[in-house]
């Protein structure tokens, strides 16, 4: 290999490029909906058994480019790219490590998610019960059920937060969680699944907040 040759990378660069365009299109829609304010939020898709395609930190989600999606290993280290991924990358990779079937993780910061995280922080969770839209979640085939969405305390120590998430995953199945004053993580086996879970939670959280207002609690 001569001095100007590019070293081979341990993942399919064409696949990374495909995923970048797939993610960018979806993220742009989320940005237009107001779910990614002030360059917040991060999004990822499984690249292969050992790597994940993920957005770099600090980019305006309304105008991402292909180079704003990089590859990281399952420990969250950038592979073949000079950019340092967000510290929150760990919250993505822990899910890919734990669940080989998971294909996509979405982290958003909508107004509804952030307000709900504040309102229910004291309880530590929000219970969504008897909504028809609960059938949008993998494993739910009836509205006659309850879905508990955890609310974790915000912290800059991602190792602590990841450990708390892992502990709860040992006890219950879930497709998303809130972080107090921060936002929401959702995931699924495919991008379509993760997006469906995100949209369902966004709608149901809005319903719960509106009900609190109608009852005079907010």
Swiss-Prot record:
<protein>
    <recommendedName>
        <fullName>Methylthioribulose-1-phosphate dehydratase</fullName>
        <ecNumber>4.2.1.109</ecNumber>
    </recommendedName>
</protein>
<dbReference type="GO" id="GO:0046570">
    <property type="term" value="F:methylthioribulose 1-phosphate dehydratase activity"/>
</dbReference>
<dbReference type="GO" id="GO:0005996">
    <property type="term" value="P:monosaccharide metabolic process"/>
</dbReference>
<keyword id="KW-0486">Methionine biosynthesis</keyword>
<dbReference type="Pfam" id="PF00596">
    <property type="entry name" value="Aldolase_II"/>
</dbReference>
<comment type="function">
    <text>Catalyzes the dehydration of methylthioribulose-1-phosphate (MTRu-1-P) into 2,3-diketo-5-methylthiopentyl-1-phosphate (DK-MTP-1-P).</text>
</comment>
<dbReference type="InterPro" id="IPR017714">
    <property type="entry name" value="MethylthioRu-1-P_deHdtase_MtnB"/>
</dbReference>
<dbReference type="InterPro" id="IPR036409">
    <property type="entry name" value="Aldolase_II/adducin_N_sf"/>
</dbReference>
<dbReference type="GO" id="GO:0005737">
    <property type="term" value="C:cytoplasm"/>
</dbReference>
<dbReference type="GO" id="GO:0008270">
    <property type="term" value="F:zinc ion binding"/>
</dbReference>
<keyword id="KW-0862">Zinc</keyword>
<keyword id="KW-0456">Lyase</keyword>
<keyword id="KW-0479">Metal-binding</keyword>
<comment type="pathway">
    <text>Amino-acid biosynthesis; L-methionine biosynthesis via salvage pathway; L-methionine from S-methyl-5-thio-alpha-D-ribose 1-phosphate: step 2/6.</text>
</comment>
<comment type="similarity">
    <text>Belongs to the aldolase class II family. MtnB subfamily.</text>
</comment>
<feature type="binding site">
    <location>
        <position position="107"/>
    </location>
    <ligand>
        <name>Zn(2+)</name>
    </ligand>
</feature>
<dbReference type="InterPro" id="IPR001303">
    <property type="entry name" value="Aldolase_II/adducin_N"/>
</dbReference>
<feature type="binding site">
    <location>
        <position position="109"/>
    </location>
    <ligand>
        <name>Zn(2+)</name>
    </ligand>
</feature>
<dbReference type="GO" id="GO:0019509">
    <property type="term" value="P:L-methionine salvage from methylthioadenosine"/>
</dbReference>
<keyword id="KW-0028">Amino-acid biosynthesis</keyword>
């Amino acid at each position: 290999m001569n001095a100007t040759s590019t070293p081979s990378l341990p993942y399919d660069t064409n696949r990374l490029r495909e995923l970048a365009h797939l993610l960018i299109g979806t993220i742009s829609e989320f940005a237009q909906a107001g779910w990614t304010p002030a360059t917040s939020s991060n999004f990822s898709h499984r690249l292969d058994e050992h790597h994940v395609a993920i957005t770099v930190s600090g980019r305006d989600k309304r105008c991402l480019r292909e180079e704003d999606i990089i590859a990281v290993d399952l420990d969250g280290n950038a592979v073949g790219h000079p950019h340092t991924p967000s510290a929150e990358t760990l919250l993505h990779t822990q899910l890919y490590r734990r669940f080989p079937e998971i294909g996509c993780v979405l982290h958003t910061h909508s107004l509804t998610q952030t307000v709900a995280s504040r309102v229910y922080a004291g309880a530590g969770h929000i219970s969504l019960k008897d909504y028809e839209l609960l059938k949008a979640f993998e494993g739910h085939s009836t509205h006659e059920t309850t879905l508990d969405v955890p609310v974790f305390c915000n912290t800059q120590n991602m190792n602590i937060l990841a450990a708390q998430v892992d502990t709860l995953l040992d006890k219950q199945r879930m497709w998303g969680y809130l972080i107090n004053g921060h936002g929401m993580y959702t995931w699924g086996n495919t991008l379509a699944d993760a997006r469906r879970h995100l949209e369902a939670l966004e709608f149901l959280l809005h319903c719960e907040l509106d009900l609190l207002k109608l009852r005079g609690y907010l």
